[in-house]
């Protein structure tokens, strides 16, 4: 590796680190700090889709190809990026938690469903789930004999380990996307407090898969590669540039996954 020159991918991650540091700046208002966390995460998603996807393809198909500035192979760049991303994610989690702690002192925050103590609040969200969420979701039960369903890019899914009355294990999956017109719902008895839609779905998941016993549950989120070659031979014959770009966009949606995020509670069975 040429130590006199900075790798493009690592340089970009340093830029995103500077974005993250804005969320730690005491001169920045609390609401804007959360915006910088969101920008950091959106940037990182895009980095995975485009740059990590490209490095992964380079590692597979052109393993001896090297970066002309640093002399790093695709595999070396990929490993260096993933080490840096692990560090940045831990840093982001610490900063986010400090922001949430500060918001709490001002009476604002996100509450887990399991921490709701007020019976009227619980009745409200049970009714909200039945009325506003349940009609919009499409649960799927997956067995070993069935192909795994296609997971859309950057969508949050609830996954559950199911057990039938005969003791057979299956997996259930529910996309939260259709129910997410508003991701946060205000808690009636707690001014400034909110609950996430996906947390409501997770809590009432036994109502969705009522014929099964829930053995484990959690969240997953897939990020798909967006690295597609505009010179791909499959695009030959497209005289209309707009039509060609529409084809490219459709292909991007179905490229291979390059990241799987799993909640702590779901890791045991995913």
What are these regions (language model features)?
Residues 1-267:
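N-terminal non-catalytic structural scaffold regions of very large proteins
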């Amino acid at each position: 590796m040429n130590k006199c020159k900075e790798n493009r991918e690592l340089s970009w991650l340093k830029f995103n680190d500077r974005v993250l540091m804005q969320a730690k700046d005491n001169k920045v208002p609390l609401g804007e700090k959360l915006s910088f966390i969101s920008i950091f995460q959106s940037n990182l998603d895009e980095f995975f889709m485009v740059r990590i996807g490209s490095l992964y393809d380079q590692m597979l198909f052109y393993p001896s190809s090297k970066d002309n500035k640093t002399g790093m192979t695709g595999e070396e760049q990929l490993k260096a990026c993933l080490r840096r991303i692990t560090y940045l994610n831990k840093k982001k989690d610490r900063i986010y938690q400090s922001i949430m702690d500060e918001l709490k002192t001002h009476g604002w925050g996100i509450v887990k469903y399991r921490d709701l103590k007020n019976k009227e609040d619980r009745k409200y969200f049970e009714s909200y789930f039945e009325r506003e969420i349940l009609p919009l979701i499409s649960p799927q039960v997956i067995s070993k004999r069935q192909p795994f369903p296609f997971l859309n890019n950057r969508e949050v899914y609830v996954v559950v380990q199911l057990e039938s009355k005969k003791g057979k294990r299956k997996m259930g999956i529910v996309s939260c996307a259709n129910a997410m017109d508003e991701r946060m719902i205000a808690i009636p008895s707690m001014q400034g407090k909110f609950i996430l839609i996906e947390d409501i779905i997770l809590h009432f998941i036994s109502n969705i898969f009522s014929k099964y016993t829930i053995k484990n549950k959690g969240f997953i989120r897939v990020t798909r590669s967006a690295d597609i070659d505009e010179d791909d031979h499959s695009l030959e014959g497209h005289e209309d540039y707009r039509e060609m770009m529409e084809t490219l966009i459709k292909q991007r949606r179905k490229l291979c996954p390059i990241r799987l995020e799993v909640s702590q509670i779901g890791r045991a069975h995913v």
